[in-house]
Amino acid sequence: MPTPSSASQHVRTVLMLLLANVFWGLSFPLIKAIAFAHQQLLPASGSWLITTCTIAPRFILAAAILAVWQRGALLRLTRSEIRQSAGLALFASAGMLFQNDGLQFTSASTSAFLTQLYAIMIPVWVALRARRLPPAVVWASCGLVLAGVAVLGRFDWRELRLGRGELETLISSLFFMGQILWLERREFAGNRAMPVTFMMFVLEAAVFTALAGALLAGGAPRAAAMPVLFMSAPWLGFTLALTLFCTVGAFSLMNTWQPKITATEAGLIYCLEPVFASLMALVLPGLFSRWAGFTYPNETLTLNLLIGGGLITAANVLIQLKPLPKP
């Protein structure tokens, strides 16, 4: 029987991880709001430029905040920590590139639920790598996810295709799967979380700054026009919120509190991220629009969202309740 102190610690841990999921859920409508603000300020921007200009400031600021907050702990990174950071940054950068671009072509709620594909693909990958067939629970979860994807993405059965936003989100989820698998490699077990997170932020900032520079060099708008973003209070406000809450806050909470509970319980808590995203997308877009002066209507609880999101959430809960052993 747990002692009162251990029970209190467990409740606090669950609450902190729930808060991390609230922050991650907030990121979906926030990223769409940043895209609308950017398009309003620089109408000649393409979706890829908007994507890189959304992500680069986020990680530049996040790295700067961690550099001040954790300055003593960030010194003397080991070779293993640098290698882990590089792998995480590679997978995360690719995932965020497709996810953020896809968000410009689908709703925040749909993106949040489709991103959860990685929760199902990880046990499939583990089973295939071990050269064994996935167990029945994995097949059942895959069936639920495929049905949920078809409903959420309004899959066109005549042309056999998904929309651009839904397809890019599914691609991003595969890279996020790679990020999680890289994070869990046994060779990195002794690495320190905060220095690895800091270096990951630095590398992601460098990647997206370089991509933004390349896009600006190749077309409109000109680089000289970019300072208009930093003179916009709404764009700055959305970017600061994305950095403080959805980047530094969410990652710090996860790194601090997730080790205190089982992976199964943490996985179940993380299934709530798209639920929080959907709830916030019902009210925040209208508030963001009134402040920034663009048109971003509140989402509604459609039958597609309820059925598709419900199927994907059920699949994630099922796979977490019957987890596969680690390889």
Can you say where each PLM-predicted feature lies in the sequence?
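Hydrophobic alpha-helical transmembrane segments of multi-pass integral membrane proteins
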Residues: 11-16, 45-68, 140-147, 164-171, ...
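Glycine-/small-residue-enriched transmembrane alpha-helix faces in small-molecule transporters
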Residues: 1-53, 90, 94, 98, ...
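C-terminal-most transmembrane helix of multi-pass membrane proteins
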Residues: 2-4, 55, 59, 154, ...
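Loop-to-transmembrane alpha-helix entry segments
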Residues: 115, 128-151, 162-166, 286-314
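Specific transmembrane alpha-helical segments of multi-pass solute transporters/efflux pumps
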Residues: 71-111, 151, 243-261
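Membrane-interface helix termini and inter-helical loops of multi-pass transporters
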Residues: 32-45, 104, 153-163, 216-233, ...
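Hydrophobic/small/kink-forming positions within alpha-helical transmembrane segments
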Residues: 22-25, 29, 60, 89, ...
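Specific alpha-helical transmembrane segments that line the substrate/conduction pathway
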Residues: 53-56, 60, 98-136, 171-173, ...
